[in-house]
Design a protein with these regions (language model features):
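Charged catalytic cores and adjacent phosphate/nucleic-acid-binding surfaces used
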Residues: 1, 13-16, 156, 161-162, ...
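An N-terminally biased module of ancient metal coordination in phosphate/nucleic-acid-related enzymes
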Residues: 1-98, 103, 175, 181, ...
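Divalent metal-binding pocket/active-site signature
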Residues: 10, 35, 96-98, 111, ...
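Alpha-helix C-cap/termination motif
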Residues: 23, 82-83, 110-111, 160, ...
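Structural preference for beta-strand elements that scaffold enzyme active sites
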Residues: 27, 87-91, 114-117, 164-165, ...
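Short, hinge-like loop/turn segments at secondary-structure boundaries
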Residues: 46-49, 108, 134-135, 184, ...
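Short secondary-structure boundary/capping elements
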Residues: 68-71, 149, 214-218
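Short, charged beta->alpha transition segments
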Residues: 73-78, 103-106, 152-157, 190
Length: 259
């Protein structure tokens, strides 16, 4: 559950907590993207340089790089000091950029978050999930090459040992572009890496209800391979506002269970 569309206040956090409690959850994870925080602006330089669309998007200081990590930590401590109706864990979703691995580690080192989610949102600086992505990426480059590079970056993320979870492992499918080659060997390699590095794989419903992709979470093929390798799977509604908390989670939870 992301706080990015609201303030870093206890009152706003409680909207998410209360909605989750109403739906019967006993534990939730609350986080925000690193593009909210000033400390992480340096790792987005490649995204800015890659496209004028992206440079303009990241220049919106009302939404991007507007808060400090210390403000977020103060909020976390404030919420944790009070009794909440359910368990609340706090973390970050970090845009992983291989060339900034050391910088990311340096920024994170002073903090003790409950979890850290690593995510790949760009292919060497070109965002794959934005309205302009078709123009700058999908219509310009070979789909097979995009997929191969995406999973190379995912593998590097997992091997970095910086993260406890991997965000939306197959959201590269968002606009329903698919490679011509068989992804199963890639999925098996990813599953093995997740187990080896003790990283949870996320089954995220956001691609379904926010972007209208037919899969409610992970593709059946990827989910089956994760379960074959006994990957620790975590469900996520990717809620960016309180009313989206838990969307479709019940539908995917039963699919992700190990019976």
């Amino acid at each position: 559950m992301h706080l990015e569309n609201g303030p870093l206040t206890k009152e706003y956090v409680m909207q998410f907590i209360n909605e989750a409690y109403k739906q019967g959850f006993d534990r939730i994870q609350i986080l925000d993207h690193t593009h909210r925080f000033k400390e992480f602006e340096v790792i987005y330089q490649g995204v800015k340089d890659a496209s004028d669309y992206q440079k303009e998007w990241l220049a919106n200081k009302k939404m991007k790089f507007k808060d400090s990590l210390s403000s977020y930590v103060r909020l976390i401590n404030e919420v944790k000091s009070e009794k909440t109706p359910i368990e609340v864990l706090f973390g970050l979703e970090v845009c992983y950029v291989p060339e900034y691995k050391d910088e990311i580690e340096r920024i994170l080192e002073p903090y003790q978050f409950d979890f850290l989610v690593g995510a790949i949102h760009s292919i060497d600086g070109l965002l794959y999930d934005m309205p302009w992505s078709k123009e700058i990426l999908w219509d310009k480059y070979n789909v097979d090459d995009i997929y191969r590079r995406y999973y190379e970056l995912i593998f590097d993320l997992v091997k970095s040992n910086l993260f406890t979870q991997l965000a939306h492992p197959d959201t590269i499918k968002m606009f329903s572009y698919y490679p011509s080659y068989d992804l199963k060997p890639t999925y098996h390699e990813l599953a093995q890496l997740l187990v080896e590095h003790h990283v949870k794989g996320e089954c995220n419903t956001g691609c379904y209800y926010r972007y209208h992709h037919p899969d409610k979470g992970l593709s059946k093929e990827l989910l089956d391979i994760f379960k074959e390798h006994h990957v620790d799977i975590i469900t996520a509604s990717d809620a960016h506002k309180p009313e989206d908390v838990g969307t479709c989670i019940k539908d995917i939870y039963k699919l992700c269970r190990y019976d």
